[in-house]
Amino acid sequence: MDRGQSLIIPPLFDGTNYAYWKVRMRAFLQSLDEKVWQAIEIGWTKPKEVLADWGEAKIKAVNFNSRALNALFSVVTNEEFKKISSTTTAKEAWTILQTTYKGTKAVKDSKF
């Protein structure tokens, strides 16, 4: 990032107005790097081999996951953090928030 360039941080998510927060958060994550967003959309799986054997591509992938997970942890209230604090992947944290506040397809279908 260029020195002096400001970064717009998404609003703190407190469990309300999820649809608005989700759009802002996605744009924020993509502004960090498209691969940060991909860590949420596609997910990341920890390789079976030891860290020393991961190679550059796997190290980059874990770093994108870590950046995404850190971003999510940083923009939620303590109450929301409790819901996602035990996750190790950004996709898992995002899915928990999405299921909690948007619902699953089955939940949506049951509302009709």
Identify the residue ranges that each predicted region occupies:
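N-terminal Lys/Arg-enriched interaction segments
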Residues: 1-112
